[in-house]
Amino acid sequence: MKRSTRKQQGFTLLEMMLVVLLAGIAAGMVVMAFPPERQNDSAWQLARFQAQLEFAAESSQVNEYMLGVRIYPDRWQFYQLQRPAASERIPIPSGDRWQGYKWQPWQPHRVSASATLPEALRLELLQADGKKVDKTQSGDDPDILILPGGEITPFRLLVKSENKALSNWLQVDNTGRFVTSMSQGKKR
């Protein structure tokens, strides 16, 4: 019997299908290794807020500007104290302590300065001693101040979950130290 002397060029269909199958199995294993969705995790949301707050405090010191945070039941927003643009200058009353400065949404480079929580989570801001924060102040003023010297208004932020056992808190004391429910074993 005579064999063909022609050389094989390329891959057979079977070899190609085997490579595609192996690539699909490998991709499936990688996807299964991803962590589960963390949006509804109060500890994750609190860690996210803490990271943003620490970044804001550091940025405030480095760039020497004043920042603030407004806490809403379903979100938080960072603000920067700025003079309005020249095009929107308004006459300044003589008794205005801020001399025309206004709180504007902070827009750091490549970092989010706000977050909205899923419906299962809610925020509650307390004073550092646990008393409720009086929200009767001007609606334009932030609840938490971050000063260029590194000082942060003392507070306790609760991230409440529908399941109370899954709720967490973050506290900043008058020395600027961060304490969380995770580091304290959820003691109140």
Swiss-Prot record:
Residues 1-10 form a propeptide. The modification N-methylphenylalanine is found at F11. Keywords: Cell inner membrane, Cell membrane, Membrane, Methylation, Protein transport, Transmembrane, Transmembrane helix, Transport. Pfam families: N_methyl (PF07963). Cleaved by prepilin peptidase. It is a single-pass membrane protein. The chain crosses the membrane at residues 13-35. It is found in: Cell inner membrane. InterPro entries: N_methyl_site (IPR012902), Pilin-like (IPR045584), T2SS_protein-GspH (IPR002416), TypeII_GspH (IPR049875). One of its GO terms (cellular component) is plasma membrane. GO terms for biological process: protein secretion by the type II secretion system. Type II secretion is composed of four main components: the outer membrane complex, the inner membrane complex, the cytoplasmic secretion ATPase and the periplasm-spanning pseudopilus. Interacts with core component OutG. Belongs to the GSP H family. Component of the type II secretion system required for the energy-dependent secretion of extracellular factors such as proteases and toxins from the periplasm. Part of the pseudopilus tip complex that is critical for the recognition and binding of secretion substrates. This is Type II secretion system protein H. It comes from Pectobacterium carotovorum subsp. carotovorum (Erwinia carotovora subsp. carotovora). The gene is outH.
